[in-house]
Amino acid sequence: MSTTQTRISQIGTVVVPVSDQDRAIEFYVDTLGFEKRADVPFGDRYRWVEVAPAEAATTIAIAVPPPGKPAGGVETGIGLNSADVDADHADLKARGVDVDDEVSRMGDPVPPLFWFRDPDGNTLMVVESR
């Protein structure tokens, strides 16, 4: 096992598979309020689209997967920070987002959190910042 460090310094982009990039852009930008940071051709048949909350360093690439790979319905493992998880839960629910029925409160050290699903059924988590 190597003891030398790599030059990897941060998480820059995570990929979420979607069936329709335009529908995903509408959800992540118009419904969640993210910024669209990139939307460029990627090869002959694809686009590279990145979205992110306004102040975030890490982006989400919403990508159509290659043929034969599933588009959506995955547990992404993505946790989004919120200063007020209760307000965001109510707000997303009012916007018609598929959110959990209520905010989970498991007690310390786990902060209050809830999960929601994008139009392709990909699950993301909102966690209250500490």
For each predicted feature, which ranges?
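Helix N-cap motif at beta-to-alpha junctions
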Residues: 20-21, 82-85
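Core segments of cupin and vicinal oxygen chelate
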Residues: 8-9, 15-58
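Short, charged/polar, Gly/Pro-enriched secondary-structure boundary elements
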Residues: 55-60, 121-124
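Short amphipathic alpha-helices within nucleic acid-binding modules
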Residues: 27, 86-91
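Vicinal oxygen chelate
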Residues: 2-7, 13-16, 39-40, 47, ...
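Short, charged/polar surface micro-motifs in flexible loops or helix N-caps
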Residues: 54-58, 67-69, 85-87
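Short polar/acidic secondary-structure junctions
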Residues: 40-42, 54, 67-68, 104-106
